[in-house]
A protein has these predicted regions:
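Chalcogenol-based redox active-site neighborhoods
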Residues: 1-163
Length: 163
């Protein structure tokens, strides 16, 4: 497990709120999802092989996440039109949010922006129904972190029993 910088959203602390484009004409705020767990999936870029495999895996496991009433949100610095084409190509059924302008602002607030490459690190956060970070993980850039850690974290939430 890679270490997160001390500036990262810490386990036990409130998750930084944000409002990002989910479509060209709609924005989604993290605070709008209070009352249910949220999985934030920061990833470097649409169309890269590892990122494509990672989000496709989560798409296949949506019923597992939803068994915990969890919402999953993908976040990268790509623009909304790029996300739209990528989601359509991969047949994704969860929002991809554009951390595009200002570039990487949300990734920076979570402590997972890679300045040298101008992309988000491959990072996962599980946020509980009250908006508190309960688990976080940064994977090496070329490694798909899979879903086991996410599912374990969801299981450990106070109301982590499956519905």
């Amino acid at each position: 497990m890679a270490n997160l910088p001390s500036s990262a959203a810490a386990v036990g602390q409130a998750a930084p709120d944000f409002r990002l484009h989910s479509t060209p004409d709609q924005k989604l705020a993290l605070s709008e999802l209070r009352g249910r767990p949220v999985v934030l999936v920061f990833y470097p870029a649409d169309w890269s092989p590892v990122c494509g495999d990672q989000v496709s895996l989560y798409n296949e496991l949506l019923s597992e996440f939803r068994a915990y009433s969890a919402e999953i949100l993908g976040i990268s610095v790509d623009g909304v039109w790029c996300h739209s084409a990528f989601a359509s190509d991969r047949k994704l059924h969860f929002p991809l949010l554009a951390d595009f302008e200002p570039k990487g602002d949300v990734a920076r607030r979570y402590g997972v922006y890679e300045e040298s490459d101008g992309v988000a690190q491959r990072a996962l956060f599980v946020i509980d129904a009250d908006g508190i970070v309960r688990w976080r993980y940064v994977s090496p850039i070329g490694i798909n972190p899979g879903a086991d850690g996410i599912l374990d974290a969801l299981e450990k939430l106070p109301q982590g029993n499956r519905t």
